[in-house]
Amino acid sequence: MGKIILLFLVSLVGLVGCGKKESRAGEVSTPKPKIQEPLPEDAEERYKVAYIRAAQAFSRNDLEGALTSLEISDQAKPKQASNANLRGAIFTRKRDWVKAEEAFRLALQLQPDLPMAQFNLGEVLFLNNKYPEAREKFQIFLNSQPKNDLGLYKMYLCDLLAGNSSKANDYLSTLKPDPMSPIYYFAKAAEAFHQGDKVAATEFVSSAYRIYPPDANSTFADSLVEKGYLTGEQMTAPTQDENKVKSEELKTLLPPVEKSGSKPKS
């Protein structure tokens, strides 16, 4: 399975980090068990701290711990869109689609202009092959972030997989290689996979991994994994350093891209 891309907010209010202390010569340093500080009594601060702990637990994939902290955050300050959005992200990772969709819809009821919840709800619908509904949510997300490549890519995939070949082809024709984003290569790979041309698709994916950082690629490759076109191993295929195009060189190899016209038709 892929690592589903979800968006949520972590506001580290008043979080202070402690630096590592050097151990004395000859001493063996052993890590001390981490003791969590008591939650603040003030309701607003309690809500914030518990939310941050929930987000941190989510990032460690401690999903039950994240839900526990969210319950505390909810009790301190009920009906918060950020809490509902994070709860949806947790249930998405647990692949509990019903609860995930319910949580994201609640987040949007509480805060209709929350772009993260629009994207995340679109992702759940996309993963469940509800492409027209997913496209609608990604479109709303893009209304607030019109140049977001991941949102544009998701819109394109919705058109491609729903059989809206005219819209998909129109958007694909606007794309060119971009030194800042692998969207061109993964959109072309998706088209090739959809047409059954695995050789061409794999070449586009390999080209992306030769050019762009792994994190940038995995964001786009995830959707191809979720749809069964790629495996997790293929997402991290090693490339030789001497064959990898450096980012400085890439800027001279690829033409500048006009992104203003690179938006799928509504």
Regions found by a protein language model. Give the residues of each.
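Canonical tetratricopeptide repeat
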Residues: 85-86, 120, 154-155, 187
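TPR/TPR-like (Sel1-like) alpha-helical repeat modules
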Residues: 141-146, 153-163, 173-181, 193-194, ...
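Alpha-helical segment of the N-proximal tetratricopeptide repeat
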Residues: 43-79, 86-89, 93
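Register position in tetratricopeptide repeats
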Residues: 59-60, 93-94, 127-128, 161, ...
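Terminal, low-structured helical/coil segments at or just beyond the last alpha-helical repeat
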Residues: 24-37, 200-266
